């Protein structure tokens, strides 16, 4: 248990930031799931639209520190390759 006033505040701040990061991660995963579903269905236009919507969410998560920037770049790159491979 926190003893000092500053330690108690730190616990409150961490709880808020954890909740925000959890929401951001969940939102990003939702967009990623939509891309996966579009790719699985084989619909190229749907996959392109889903990727177009997901890319800013993935990069925003990286910018906010929820995921590493290289992880975000790798996800976007691999999704782009898979969308281009659809014919």
Curated annotation (Swiss-Prot):
It holds the Pfam family Ribosomal_S20p. GO terms for biological process: translation. Keywords: Ribonucleoprotein, Ribosomal protein, RNA-binding, rRNA-binding. GO terms for cellular component: cytosol; small ribosomal subunit. GO terms for molecular function: small ribosomal subunit rRNA binding; structural constituent of ribosome. The keyword Transcription regulation does not apply. NCBIfam families: S20. Binds directly to 16S ribosomal RNA. Belongs to the bacterial ribosomal protein bS20 family. This is Small ribosomal subunit protein bS20. The gene is rpsT.
């Amino acid at each position: 248990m926190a003893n000092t006033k500053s330690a108690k505040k730190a616990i409150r701040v961490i709880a808020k930031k954890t909740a925000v990061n959890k929401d951001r991660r969940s939102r990003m995963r939702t967009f990623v799931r939509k891309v996966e579903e579009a790719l699985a269905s084989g619909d190229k236009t749907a996959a392109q639209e889903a990727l177009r919507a997901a890319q800013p969410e993935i990069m925003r998560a990286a910018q906010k520190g929820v995921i590493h920037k290289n992880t975000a770049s790798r996800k976007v790159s691999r999704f782009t390759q898979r969308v281009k491979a659809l014919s």
